[in-house]
């Protein structure tokens, strides 16, 4: 992992897509004026946009910057860029992909259809293009359903951005399935409670990592997220390579950019244990599956002690304790 040092398309249309520009002559699409509706205007990197009632954080701008930078570099090297923004909020991330990364197409999805008018107004700053070759489309459904529909219709994407809340790992497999080979997967976790080791059984269920309290929980949170993606990809016979990771204390927010390709992991060095001693502060990493044989005998010979050393398997094994 580097901590910030960074299929074939078919012509079948999406059956679940809405018209991104409502019919102005339809009474159901007219803008309803309501005193309870807020129209908040913001500016990010020179782009003006509305937030409305959608969830938006100024502090997440750096994470969006990194996503746009990776997308722009991908477009420069591949000469194409199709993006799926699975949880787009007010649409500023999708707008920046269109304007700054010059994406050929962006599918902006958000499950909350109350945000539709705001998203469409923001994206309308970029000409939509023709019906045959649109630049952007807006949908309002579950992100997993959108990605699964795209996968079934062989509508693959070069970059999929999943800016999710908490530690919802259910997005991992649908996102990997809908991604083009050699594509980029931008994942998010905001579950600082689990990465801090306060819910080890929750992190085990979500990412296959049994996490205990450690002084470097920010790094563990990033590794936990990457490890979950590596495991899901390996089940599908795919290989994940981390390009960069980003941590921010607000939230907190863990973001990782991954490249997904054909081929399984060449060895078991990606499966490791991390140990930490609360007495002396020493930390150790045991690489490979042989670490089970290296650490387990010591644990069996020593009494379990909360003041001793514990080992954390980043995938499936409970903590292993030994005396410091």
Give residue ranges: language-model regions:
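SAM-dependent transferase fold signal centered on methyltransferase-like domains
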Residues: 2-324
